[in-house]
Amino acid sequence: MEFDNSFEVPLPPDRAWPVLMNVQGIAPCMPGAQLTEMVDDKSYKGNIAVRLGPVALTFAGLVTFEDIDNANHTARVRAQGTDAKGRGSAQAAATFRLEPSSTGSKVLVHTNLTLSGAVAQYGRGVGMIQATASALMNQFANNLKKQLVNPPDPAAVDTAVKPISATSLAGLVVWNSIKDKLGGKS
């Protein structure tokens, strides 16, 4: 399945791009994500914990930057992971790019996601997958904005992996529906 997400950051593209390319720096902004190993300068191993409805899943996998165009602020990333309990796998190909905006930069993300095994059954409703992806992206964007405005003290960073909760997901789905009806205004 394919879906698109976007968010804004308070930096112009030339300053936002290096921040987004610093995977180790932004990984803590992604809810439920944890880097476990830097394989090389373009590949990273890690885990991500998510909920699809009532089912908690933890995927261990590899993220690889396949194409990076620093001049045009675009990148293509491939991720693949397997559920820790053997319930299936996920593969994603994502492209993202930065565009100038009135507040700094708009980050546009296009994702093609494939789920297999029991995991595909848990998330068979496309709406649930899109809502989960949107909720993760919204939380990532909010965490990234906070980090850009007030960089954390490295000693105070909480590294515990917490999956996005069903309550948070439901709240974000309702909020996004309201925003869509109001024309995307927050």
What is the role of each PLM region?
Residues M1-G53, T159-S186:
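Hydrophobic ligand-binding cavity/cleft-lining segments
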Residues N5-F7, A33-Q34, A60-D67, A92-P100:
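Hydrophobic/aromatic beta-strand elements that line small-molecule binding cavities or substrate pockets
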Residues D67, G81-T132:
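Beta-strand/loop substructures that line and gate deep hydrophobic ligand-binding cavities in soluble
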